[in-house]
Amino acid sequence: MATLDISEPVFAETIENNQLVILDFWAEWCGPCKAYGPVYERVSEAFPDVVFGKINTEEQQTLAGMFGIRSIPTTIAFKEGCLLYTSPSPRDG
């Protein structure tokens, strides 16, 4: 399954209607996001039963604020609607 672009109007529905959801918070200008993005896409294809979403922090500032995103890329995971994991993604160096 390819990644989904997640926006505020579909966020709650996505979290509530899927058992496992992994979200990548990113931005166009972010160098580490550009490196992490293709890896995230490949992983999403390897796990078709998991919903992988991408949230552009520039376009979805309310969602980024809701989770206190201060560093990108940041990955968060929900299981059965509950926040399970949050972590800034690995960076080179």
Indicate where each model-derived feature is located.
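Conserved helix-turn-beta segment immediately C-terminal to the redox Cys motif
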Residues: 20, 37-55
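Conserved Rossmann-like nucleotide-binding pocket used by diverse enzymes
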Residues: 2, 26, 51-53
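Single conserved hydrophobic/aromatic residue that forms the stacking wall/gate
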Residues: 85-93
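Structural microenvironment flanking redox-active thiols in thiol-disulfide oxidoreductases
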Residues: 55-63
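A short, hydrophobic beta-strand/beta-hairpin element that forms part of a small beta-sheet core
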Residues: 73-84
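Short active-site neighborhood of thiol/selenol oxidoreductases, capturing the structured segment around
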Residues: 17-26
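Conserved redox-active cysteine motifs that mediate thiol-disulfide chemistry
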Residues: 25-38
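N-terminal "domain-start" segment that seeds a small globular fold
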Residues: 1-16
